[in-house]
Amino acid sequence: MTPVGPAVRGEAPVTLREIRVAFFRNLNLGQARSHSPTSSQLLDAFVEAGARAPSHVGTNGTVVYYHSTGPTLVRRVAKLLTPMCGYHDMVTVRSGSALIELHRRLRGLRDGEVILYDTTPGFDPPTPIESDDGLIVISLDHRRAITQHRLGSRPTAAGPFIASLVGVPTTTRSITTMRRVADRVREYAGA
């Protein structure tokens, strides 16, 4: 058994910064054609990598867990998943505090999408940006974009549009899903 630190063992207090959320791209639990793990394979990989109390929110590769460091653990998880089921795609991680702040930013918005990625700090183009078919990017920085769409329009998917703007792979969740993720983070924090 690999030794783990005190925060992972539950011997230290947990803060919002120790609550992490991993967002996997193109991971749909139990879907073999997308080389996705089952629920138990995914959660077991998190535990084996050193996370404490992982749980997924829905079936789209969103996992909330306790760990004192950020992306290091999810890189280990991704390496464990590759031989297990063939999954090999982008994953990004955010702290619990970042998710609570994002939830505040989503207040009052109708359903749209949140697109997550990692680029160089300082990337902060002016918004709003509107596509020809009615997709409106209302917020965009080096780690995430928030989109809506013009009423009555049927815009293309936000993920590819944002990926073309930021130049890196992205993963997308609906605003409704992100609200559920923030609720799970609050549960983990005991708030």
Regions found by a protein language model. Name each.
Residues 13-60, 64-191:
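Surface-exposed, charge/polar-rich loops and edge strands
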Residues 1-15:
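N-terminal amphipathic/basic-hydrophobic helices that include classical n-h-c signal peptides
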